[in-house]
Amino acid sequence: MQSLLDGHHHQLPSLLQQHHNGHHLLDQHQQHQHQLPPQATTTSESDGRAPRDELEMSKSGGSDNLESGGGGGGGGSGDDQDPNQRPRKKRYHRHTQHQIQELEAFFKECPHPDDKQRKELSRELGLEPLQVKFWFQNKRTQMKTQHERHENNALRAENEKLRAENMRYKEALANASCPNCGGPAAIGEMSFDEHHLRLENARLRDEIDRISAIAAKYVGKPAAAVSAAYPPLPPSNRSPLDHMGIPGAGADVFGADFDKPLVIELAVAAMEELVRMAQLGEPLWAPALGGEALGEEEYARTFPRGLGPKSPELRSEASRETAVVIMNHVSLVEMLMDVGQWTALFSSIVSRAATLEVLSTGVAGNHNGALQLMSAEFQMPSPLVPTRETQFLRYCKQHPDGTWAVVDVSLDGLRAGAGGGCQPAAARGHRRRPSGCLIQEMPNGYSKVTWVEHVEADDQMVHNLYKPVVNSGMAFGARRWVATLERQCERLASAMASNVASSGDAGVITTSEGRRSMLKLAERMVASFCGGVTASTTHQWTTLSGSGAEDVRVMTRKSVDDPGRPPGIVLNAATSFWLPVPPSRVFDFLRDDSTRSEWDILSNGGVVQEMAHIANGRDHGNAVSLLRVNNANSNQSNMLILQECCTDATGSYVIYAPVDVVAMNVVLNGGDPDYVALLPSGFAILPDGPDGGGGSLLTVAFQILVDSVPTAKLSLGSVATVNSLIACTVERIKAAITGDNGVAPPCPR
């Protein structure tokens, strides 16, 4: 203030006295704030930021002028006054109505006048420049306070609306009941207070952050401007399930009375159970032969409500497995959430899958929060193990630590009028409790996968020969899922290799395009073989005969307008039996080219030559080959054999199909493999128990074209011929592997 006085020494003494009185007012401001009326004009140290004391005095725009009282306005500096002298009485000068109107009009045009504009106003209105300056400061403070109050009221009303909506959801979930039996709907082991209040707290924290951001960034702006400048929270700051609401989603499958909050609660509860199941150790999981076993009593204590009561008609299966796979975590999540890629990745386990409804697409750019209703059919490569069909929710979420989780859970008890009900799982024979995997990013493009399978299934139709395998989890458990995933990830890495020479290839493959086409053709061959063994409904097989362990199950299918299969009537014969030798020995025998003539009718006693070889992983048993049979007495010189061999801890496969030479040349040159017609045959080899040290369970399956006319009638002679062929092959394999010196029966030509 002293510098200001020095810069204006040429002004009149009266002005100097007023400046001095203003300075004295600041000295006394803190002591007499409670005495000031709401319309006092005060001084400030800065031009845009009024002190907090001035906020309390600016309610009416600052239209009064406060000066020192007493006689004629004379007096010296505050430092020259007697400290014992009683402070003079203050007096206030209210601005005239004309002055206020002029100041208000100028404020609308320019709320921040500069020094020149303030001096002009002071001359026009008969005020001091400092009075004009402080009036504008207080006016801006007043406007800021009003806008703050308006915005806070709006946000408070919005917050109350969210609380009311939350209470409605709470009441709906608390009173949820099964529409068929009227009983309570069990939607997870978490109570509402454990989970929904947690969601409410998270949402309220978001609202607090939002209000704070507005107050810090947009204070002083009109409410409309704030709304336009501060859009709704971006997807990354919202719950992933907030993206639900795709037009038409859920209407067809769930019905018109589809309860979206209940489905959300089911998915969230399943996700939390999966994460805990994957992370907890003993006593929930205990070491067992071939892996880990779930403690049922501890599970009941850890998840007291579970996801509905267990059905007494279904047997519980639970398993957990962990592995590091050669696939990027983002790519793995993408494959799990795409039904086509998921089916191809696990073609030996999933014979059919479909996405029925997409309830949430998740956050843009990834699958965080994606929620969809799916159906699937799971298979075991044997006619003695029935397939398992189910419908389930699949929910994907990225957790704060970066870990991805994908969980499946059946919809039992939630769906009415769409094949649902209180116990639809018992009718279908399969129910998925929270099952899925946690995916953690690892260096160099690898991912750590922890897989949990927890299902209830009806195993009454499983043949006694396969019950030890099914009960141990090697048939449908986490160990098989993870082993298949490891093997398939290595296969995909091999398919993406750009250097043909360094990838273990040999023979006629010269380009990476031809290599990928050949691998794609082999992939389709394996999927067709597995679907034929189990009589999957996807592949439209009709069972003609076969029920016992020694029986051959014969199925038929008509192929029309399918470029991937020859037109006509196709017979599929499959049988399973036990061999008293380890699976590795059976696998090595069946994939050995030198012993192929001992069992393969296609070789017809000729010499088998490998023309191309593609290594599919670290295990030398995982490979795709192109074989030629050299037989001087055969007229099939134009026939090649495409073969894929694969093995892992839970089983092995040797699958092959005759292919035309011309069509195969197109594939080797990078052509479309979908137009190559093939009928696969082959073997599935499984250990007969979880220890893997006993015998083997071998499944043999042939697909044979018996008539090229699709409308022709199937003759009994064709069925008898196929039965004889598979019986002959089984006897030859038994004789060769077990060392039986007996003469194998001749196979039909």
From Swiss-Prot:
START domain mapped to chain residues: 256-494
Record's compositionally biased regions (Gly residues): 68-78
Keyword set, alphabetical order: Coiled coil, DNA-binding, Homeobox, Nucleus, Transcription, Transcription regulation
The UniProt record lists the keyword Transcription: yes
Biased composition (Basic residues): 86-97
Localisation: Nucleus
CC terms in the record's Gene Ontology section: nucleus
Predominant subcellular localization, coarse grouping: nucleus
Coiled coil: 137-218
Disulfide-bonded cysteines: none
Record Pfam families: Homeodomain (PF00046), START (PF01852)
The entry's DNA-binding region: 88-147
Disordered, as annotated region: 26-98
GO molecular function: DNA binding; DNA-binding transcription factor activity, RNA polymerase II-specific; lipid binding
Ranges of Basic and acidic residues composition bias in the record: 46-57
Family as reported in the entry's similarity comment: Belongs to the HD-ZIP homeobox family. Class IV subfamily.
Role this protein plays: Probable transcription factor.
PANTHER family in UniProt: HOMEOBOX-LEUCINE ZIPPER PROTEIN MERISTEM L1 (PTHR45654), HOMEOBOX-LEUCINE ZIPPER PROTEIN ROC7 (PTHR45654:SF80)
Protein name (Swiss-Prot/TrEMBL): Homeobox-leucine zipper protein ROC7
The encoding gene: ROC7
